[in-house]
C-alpha cells in the first residue's frame, strides 16, 4: 500500500516577533530582533533581565465566547498554544467548531482530526502559591509538609492543578476545535515540537486521521522558569545592555541564549483530502527522524561534542524523504547560541553534509525571538515552510565570525531556489528531531 503524502497547510507562529505568519515573516525578512527588557515581572534581581515576550496578545480574543470561562484555568503556555492553533486553523482556511460562524459545517469530521502538541514543564505563578507556602512555615521558618497538607493546601484553589498539567495545551486545543481523533502530548524540552510534528505525520500516514494540529508552545517568562534556565548555565548574562545582539547562533563569540515565549502550531493534512477540499499548501513533509544523544561524561547536561545523535536524526529524515544530503537547500537549525550546543550541531552537519555544508544557508530564529523552549521547533517549521512557499531565505543576524565551514554569517533576505529545507532540534535531555520539507511541485 502506498504511504499517504502529507502537506503543511496552516501556519500559526507566536513569539516576540508577532502573532501569526504575516508579522513573523515580515520580521524575519527584515532581520528584526524582538528581544528587550522583561516587563511581565521584575527581573532586575536576576543575572539576566532581557527576553522575548509576546506582546499585545490576549487569549480571550481568540477563544470562542462559549468557552471563555476556561481562560481562567489556562497558564500562559496554554494560552499561547490556543492562540497559535487559532492562527494556524484560520491560515489553512479551515472551519472548525472553534471558528465556525452561523453553525457552518466543519471542514473535516471531528473524528478525522487529531492533535499532537509539544509542552513544557509549566511553571506556576508565584502569587498563587505564596499564601499557601507562608501558612506551611512553622516558627523556625523551615517548610513543613504536614503543615502544608493540613493548612497550606486549603489556600490553593481546587482547580489550580488544571492550569499546570502539560497535557492541557492539547486538551484545550482539542476541545475548542472539536478534534476527536488521536491526541497526544510530547514533553521533551526543546525537541517537543519537532517530535510532536513527527507523531502527527505518522498518524496521518497510517490513515488514523486526515488532519492534525501539531507543534508546541512554552512561556519561559516566569520567575521560576527564569531561575531554572539560569541554573543550566545556558543563558547569556553578559549582554543585558544590548539585547538585539545578545543571541549569536554559530558565532565564535556566542555567549549563551536568551529565553522567550511562544512557539508554533501547524496544520498537517493528507494531500488527498486537501485536494478534495480544494485547499492550498505551503510545503510537503517528506521525512522525519528522531534519536537520543548520550553524553555520559556530562550526564547529558551538555551535548555530545561530535553531534552523533543529531546526525542520526538528520540521516533518518533524509532516508524517509529519499533524498541525498546534497538535495538540502536551507537549514533551520536548533541554533541555541551556546558554544557547546552550536559546535555539536555544527559537527553533526559536517558529518552529514561534508563540503556541501559551506553552500547551505543556516537561518536561526532564536537570534531574533529567543528560545521558546518546547515551542521552538514549532516556530522553526513555520519559518521553514514559509521560506519554501516564498522561495526566499530570511535574513540572518548576529553572526559576524561564524564557526568554520558554516554558511551562517549575517546576511539580508534573498530570493533562492529552495527545493528542500531541513529543520532540526535537540534538547537538554538529548532528544533530537529532524524534519525535511519539500516544495509542493515535487
Regions found by a protein language model. Give the residues of each.
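A glycine- and small-aliphatic-rich helix-loop capping segment at beta-alpha/alpha-beta transitions
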Residues: 22-26, 124-142, 204-206, 226-239, ...
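Acyl-CoA/ACP chain-elongation machinery
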Residues: 39, 210-255, 288-305, 333-343, ...
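Active-site-proximal alpha-helical scaffold in enzymes
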Residues: 81-94, 166-170, 174-177, 183-218, ...
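Glycine-/small-residue-rich "gating" segment that lines the acyl/pantetheine channel
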Residues: 137-156, 198, 202, 218-275, ...
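Conserved beta-ketoacyl condensing-enzyme motif
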Residues: 8, 29-177, 181-184, 217-226, ...
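Active-site nucleophile and cofactor-binding loops and adjacent substrate-binding regions
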Residues: 42, 73-79, 108-110, 160-166, ...
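ACP-dependent fatty acid/polyketide chain-elongation machinery
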Residues: 1-70, 92, 272-284, 382-397, ...
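Condensing-enzyme catalytic core mediating Claisen C-C bond formation in acyl metabolism
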Residues: 5-9, 33-37, 242-323, 329-330, ...
Amino acid at each position: 500500500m502506498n504511504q499517504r503524502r502529507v502537506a503543511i497547510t496552516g501556519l500559526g507562529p507566536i513569539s516576540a516577533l508577532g502573532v501569526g505568519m504575516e508579522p513573523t515573516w515580515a520580521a524575519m525578512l527584515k532581520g528584526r530582533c524582538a528581544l528587550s527588557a522583561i516587563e511581565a515581572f521584575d527581573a532586575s534581581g536576576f543575572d539576566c533581565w532581557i527576553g522575548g515576550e509576546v506582546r499585545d496578545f490576549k487569549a480571550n480574543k481568540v477563544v470562542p465566547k462559549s468557552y471563555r470561562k476556561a481562560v481562567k484555568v489556562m497558564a500562559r503556555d496554554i494560552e499561547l498554544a490556543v492562540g497559535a492553533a487559532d492562527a494556524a486553523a484560520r491560515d489553512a482556511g479551515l472551519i472548525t467548531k472553534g471558528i465556525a460562524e452561523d453553525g457552518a459545517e466543519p471542514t473535516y469530521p471531528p473524528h478525522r482530526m487529531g492533535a499532537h502538541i509539544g509542552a513544557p514543564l509549566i511553571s506556576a505563578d508565584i502569587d498563587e502559591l505564596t499564601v499557601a507556602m507562608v501558612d506551611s512555615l512553622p516558627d523556625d521558618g523551615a517548610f513543613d509538609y504536614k503543615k502544608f497538607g493540613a493548612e497550606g493546601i486549603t489556600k490553593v484553589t481546587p482547580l489550580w492543578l488544571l492550569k499546570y498539567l502539560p497535557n492541557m495545551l492539547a486538551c484545550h486545543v482539542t476541545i475548542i476545535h472539536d478534534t476527536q481523533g488521536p491526541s497526544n502530548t510530547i514533553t521533551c524540552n526543546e525537541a517537543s515540537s519537532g517530535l510532536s510534528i513527527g507523531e502527527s505525520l505518522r498518524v496521518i500516514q497510517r490513515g488514523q486521521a486526515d488532519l492534525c494540529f501539531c507543534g508546541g508552545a512554552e512561556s519561559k517568562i516566569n520567575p521560576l522558569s527564569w531561575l531554572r534556565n539560569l541554573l543550566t548555565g545556558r543563558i547569556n548574562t553578559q549582554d543585558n545592555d544590548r539585547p538585539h545582539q545578545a543571541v549569536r547562533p554559530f558565532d565564535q563569540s556566542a555567549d549563551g541564549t536568551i529565553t522567550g515565549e511562544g512557539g508554533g502550531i501547524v496544520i498537517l493534512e493528507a494531500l488527498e483530502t486537501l485536494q478534495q477540499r480544494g485547499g492550498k499548501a505551503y510545503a510537503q513533509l517528506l521525512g522525519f527522524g528522531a534519536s537520543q544523544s548520550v553524553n555520559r561524561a556530562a550526564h547529558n547536561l551538555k551535548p555530545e561534542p561530535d553531534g552523533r545523535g543529531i546526525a542520526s536524526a538528520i540521516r533518518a529524515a533524509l532516508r524517509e524523504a529519499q533524498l541525498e544530503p546534497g538535495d538540502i537547500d536551507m537549514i533551520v537549525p536548533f541554533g541555541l547560541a551556546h558554544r557547546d550546543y552550536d559546535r555539536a550541531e555544527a559537527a553533526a552537519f559536517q558529518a552529514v553534509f561534508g563540503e556541501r555544508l559551506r553552500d547551505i544557508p543556516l537561518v536561526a530564529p532564536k537570534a531574533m525571538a529567543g528560545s521558546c523552549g518546547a515551542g521552538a521547533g514549532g516556530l522553526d517549521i513555520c519559518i521553514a515552510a514559509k521560506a519554501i512557499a516564498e522561495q526566499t531565505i530570511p535574513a540572518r543576524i548576529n553572526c559576524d565570525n561564524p564557526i568554520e565551514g558554516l554558511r551562517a554569517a549575517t546576511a539580508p533576505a534573498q530570493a533562492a531556489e529552495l527545493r528542500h529545507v531541513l529543520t532540526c532540534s535537540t534538547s537538554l535531555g538529548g532528544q533530537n528531531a529532524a524534519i525535511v520539507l519539500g516544495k509542493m511541485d515535487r
